[in-house]
């Protein structure tokens, strides 16, 4: 699906807020451009955040307008697109525009959603639920494979640890790798403190650098990073998104470490 010698970088804002998403996408392309030989960038954003903590929180522009926006970004920037879906009907519509459709962590056991996502023949990114062990991902994988679609990505995004907390177990990455599909580490949702702010999730972005480096060292194919020009003003996941400025600062180390691990793996084979 992707060049194995390139680090996947699935990056973009949590949700489409307004037309500023175009400028964010353009800026991301500029940031990644110097690393074109080492990084495979995929733009991500959501048209609907269907699992917000509060009914009063912003969800997004909706399916129709959101997919229109993503289609324009895809055409203008010549970039692959990922978005998340929440029902079989949404999966069918999103696959008409997006190269990758994502099954959210909370929905990763929903059989109808997984099967329909597979039937679209798009690449399917399955996010491991916070409530699942890595071994239990065999079930979601089998549901997609039952459609004849083997284009699967597995994303680790942390595991529930008591109330309002997540931990990242790097052993999970090795377990997921053994399924034989590309494994991605979600460096921003992994630092969330779910429900810690009552009507929304908190976050500890200061741990993004160490967790992303650890995941690369553990052997992931890429990183999933939600990013925003000014996270503090973001309409969703403000407490856990990485600023574009910080992404630009961290990217060189990610690429260097990924390249080193690839070289070490080649020697050890």
From Swiss-Prot:
It comes from the Bacteria. GO terms for cellular component: cytosol. Keywords: Cytoplasm, Lipopolysaccharide biosynthesis, Transferase. The keyword Transferase applies. Pfam families: DAHP_synth_1. Its main location: cytoplasm. InterPro entries: Aldolase_TIM, DAHP1/KDSA, KDO8P_synthase. Belongs to the KdsA family. This is 2-dehydro-3-deoxyphosphooctonate aldolase. The lineage of its organism: Bacteria, Pseudomonadati, Chlamydiota, Chlamydiia, Chlamydiales. The gene is kdsA.
């Amino acid at each position: 699906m992707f060049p194995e010698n390139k680090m996947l970088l699935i990056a973009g804002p949590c949700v489409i807020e307004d037309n500023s998403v175009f400028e964010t996408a353009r800026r991301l392309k500029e940031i990644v451009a110097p690393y074109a030989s080492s990084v495979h960038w995929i733009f991500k954003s959501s048209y609907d955040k269907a699992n917000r903590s509060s009914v009063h929180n912003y969800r997004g522009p909706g399916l129709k307008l959101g997919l229109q926006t993503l289609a324009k970004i895809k055409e203008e920037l010549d970039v692959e697109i990922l978005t998340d879906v929440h029902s079989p009907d949404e999966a069918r519509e999103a696959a008409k525009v997006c190269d990758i459709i994502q099954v959210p962590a909370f929905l990763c056991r929903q059989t109808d959603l997984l099967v329909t996502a597979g039937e679209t023949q798009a690449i399917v990114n399955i996010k491991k639920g916070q409530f699942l062990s890595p071994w239990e991902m065999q079930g979601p994988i089998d549901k997609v494979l039952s459609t004849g679609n083997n284009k699967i990505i597995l994303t680790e995004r942390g595991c529930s640890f008591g109330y309002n907390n997540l931990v990242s177990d790097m052993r999970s990455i090795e377990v997921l790798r053994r399924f034989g599909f590309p494994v991605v580490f979600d460096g921003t949702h992994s630092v969330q403190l779910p429900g810690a702010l009552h009507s929304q999730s908190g976050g500890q972005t200061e741990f993004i650098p160490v967790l992303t480096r650890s995941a690369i060292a553990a052997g992931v194919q890429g990183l999933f990073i939600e990013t925003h020009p000014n996270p503090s003003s973001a309409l969703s996941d403000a407490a856990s998104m990485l600023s574009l400025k910080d992404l630009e600062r961290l990217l060189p180390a990610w690429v260097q470490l990924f390249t080193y691990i690839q070289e070490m793996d080649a020697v050890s084979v």
